[in-house]
């Protein structure tokens, strides 16, 4: 039971990290492309 909690928490943490990285990359590419 305890293992499932840690697994879900880790999964959410990794997904959040990946989402932030993708969002940051998209914003950076847009900023460099338009310079707005």
From Swiss-Prot:
- What coarse category fits the chief subcellular location reported for this protein? membrane
Supply one GO BP term.
photosynthesis
Q: Note the InterPro entries from the entry.
A: PetM_cyt_b6/f_cplx_su7
Its keywords, alphabetically, are: Cell inner membrane, Cell membrane, Electron transport, Membrane, Photosynthesis, Transmembrane, Transmembrane helix, Transport
Report membrane topology: Single-pass membrane protein
- Which cell locations does it reside in? Cell inner membrane
- Span-the-membrane segments of this chain are 5-25
Question: What GO molecular function terms would the record report?
Answer: electron transfer activity
Give GO cellular component annotations, separated by semicolons: cytochrome b6f complex; plasma membrane
Report the protein's function. Component of the cytochrome b6-f complex, which mediates electron transfer between photosystem II (PSII) and photosystem I (PSI), cyclic electron flow around PSI, and state transitions.
UniProt record similarity statement:
Belongs to the PetM family.
Indicate the quaternary assembly: The 4 large subunits of the cytochrome b6-f complex are cytochrome b6, subunit IV (17 kDa polypeptide, PetD), cytochrome f and the Rieske protein, while the 4 small subunits are PetG, PetL, PetM and PetN. The complex functions as a dimer.
Q: Mind telling me what this protein is named? A: Cytochrome b6-f complex subunit 7
Gene name for this UniProt entry:
petM
